[in-house]
């Protein structure tokens, strides 16, 4: 079977538009947007894991907050006690900065101004 040049050109003329038509339909863009509810099994599992981690660290966060608040209260009380000690009418009262207490100069005992 001998195919002549004119038959090849004719066949090419028929197949080329078909190939172009198929290639454009294969690569056609779509303008549809798929919106998921976000309620997939993976997202639920991820949310459950995050909640579990948040709950596990809750005690630690509370301890840190309580410790910080306790230290602040202690420093605040010491500041007030220092002011009271320094303004005391007792001339033997002095403020001990290392122990944060008001002491008597003569005895070294704690006094309340």
UniProtKB/Swiss-Prot annotation:
Offer a single GO CC term for the protein. cell outer membrane
Q: Which UniProt keywords apply?
A: Signal
State the source organism's domain of life: Bacteria
Its signal peptide is 1-28
HAMAP family linked to this entry: UPF0482
NCBIfam families with a match to the protein in the record: PRK13659.1 (NF010180)
* Protein family: Belongs to the UPF0482 family.
Q: What is this protein called?
A: UPF0482 protein YnfB
What organism, scientifically named, is this protein from? Answer: Escherichia coli (strain K12)
Q: What is the lineage of its organism?
A: Bacteria, Pseudomonadati, Pseudomonadota, Gammaproteobacteria, Enterobacterales
């Amino acid at each position: 079977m001998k195919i002549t040049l004119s038959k090849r050109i004719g066949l090419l003329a028929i197949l080329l538009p078909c190939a172009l038509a198929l290639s454009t339909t294969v690569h056609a863009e779509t303008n549809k947007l798929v919106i998921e509810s976000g309620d997939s099994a993976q997202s639920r599992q991820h949310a459950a894991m995050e909640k579990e981690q948040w709950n596990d660290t809750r005690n630690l966060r509370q301890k840190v907050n309580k410790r910080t608040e306790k230290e602040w209260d202690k420093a605040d009380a010491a500041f007030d006690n220092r002011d009271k000690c320094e303004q005391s009418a007792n001339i033997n009262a002095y403020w001990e900065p290392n122990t944060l207490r008001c002491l008597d100069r003569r005895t070294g005992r704690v006094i309340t101004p």
